[in-house]
Design a protein with these regions (language model features):
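N-terminal glycine/threonine-rich, aromatic-flanked beta-hairpin/loop signature
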Residues: 52-98
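Hydrophobic helical h-region of N-terminal Sec-dependent signal peptides
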Residues: 9-17
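Short secondary-structure boundary/capping segments
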Residues: 31-34, 89, 112
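Beta-sheet ligand-binding and adhesion/scaffold domains
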Residues: 48, 57-61, 67, 96-140
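Bacterial N-terminal signal peptides that target proteins for export
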Residues: 2-10
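C-terminal motif of bacterial Sec signal peptides marking the signal peptidase cleavage site
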Residues: 18-22
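Structural detector for hydrophobic anchor residues on beta-strands
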Residues: 38, 42, 66-68, 120
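N-terminal helix-cap/turn-to-beta initiation motif at the start of protein domains
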Residues: 27-43, 140
């Protein structure tokens, strides 16, 4: 009887430990994405355009200290020369990647951000309004 009670107590404690650990938020994925972004340039469309409404492709350089730069080029430029350079601050929390370009630009957030190999995908929000799906590809 004592052995059975001891066994049930151990089983109860194991179940309790598993149950409590599953209630904690999983920041492991945030750390993985945070560590994956620096290195290379992430190229794709983030909705930027010039004064004449010509679309620009963004090339994002992420640094490990939460800052980065966006080198933008015209889609139809065969040489891919940089037309604009914009600094930004970035962070990730709860699978939301925030790109803050400062007061003169809207806050960009990529929800449900997912990195698989050299592709980053998610849903782009501009100042809190959904813009649509986005995908960036890493180039070296």
């Amino acid at each position: 009887m004592r052995k059975m009670r001891k066994f049930l107590n151990i089983l109860f404690l194991c179940t309790l430990a598993l149950g409590l650990s599953s209630c904690e938020p999983d920041d492991g994925e945030d750390y993985y994405i945070y560590d994956t972004l620096p290195g290379g340039i992430w190229v794709g469309d983030l909705g930027f355009a010039d004064a004449y409404n010509s679309p620009l492709e963004s090339g994002l350089y992420f640094e490990g200290n939460g800052v980065g730069k966006d080198e933008q080029a015209y889609y139809n430029d065969p040489y891919g020369e940089v037309a604009f350079r914009l600094p930004f601050r970035w962070d990730i929390h709860g699978r939301i990647l925030r790109l803050d370009y400062g007061y003169n630009y809207p806050l960009l957030e990529i929800y449900d951000v997912y990195v698989a190999g050299d592709r980053l995908s998610g849903v782009l929000y501009v100042d809190g309004h959904m813009d649509g799906p986005v995908m960036q590809e890493r180039q070296y």
